[in-house]
């Protein structure tokens, strides 16, 4: 009986500590608000600019606008790089 009375609180304490550690790990893996968004926006703007400028140059040379291959999961659509 004494073993059962000791085991129950011990298991409860271990469960609480495990849950707390899991929550802390999850929070540490979440993206920070603000800073990464601005970095991604800058990358998006660069990709949009690169693709549209490339197509405009090709059009001025009396050639069909060939789609520029965007790298990293992006593709050129309507003179813009869009995420696939």
Curated annotation (Swiss-Prot):
According to its record, what are the GO cellular component terms? extracellular region; host cell postsynaptic membrane
Disulfide connectivity for this sequence is: 51-65, 55-76, 70-81
Q: Entry's InterPro entries?
A: Hwtx-2-like
Pfam families registered for this protein in UniProt: Toxin_20
- Keywords associated with the record: Disulfide bond, Neurotoxin, Postsynaptic neurotoxin, Secreted, Signal, Toxin
Write out the tissue specificity statement of the associated record. Answer: Expressed by the venom gland.
The stretch of residues making up the signal peptide is 1-22
Q: What is its main location?
A: secreted
Q: Which positions does the propeptide occupy?
A: 23-47
Q: Which top-level group of life is the source organism from? A: Eukaryota
Family to which this protein belongs: Belongs to the neurotoxin 12 (Hwtx-2) family. 02 (Hwtx-2) subfamily.
What the protein does comes down to: Postsynaptic neurotoxin.
**Name of the protein this chain belongs to:** U4-theraphotoxin-Hhn1a
Species = Cyriopagopus hainanus
Lineage in the entry?
Eukaryota, Metazoa, Ecdysozoa, Arthropoda, Chelicerata
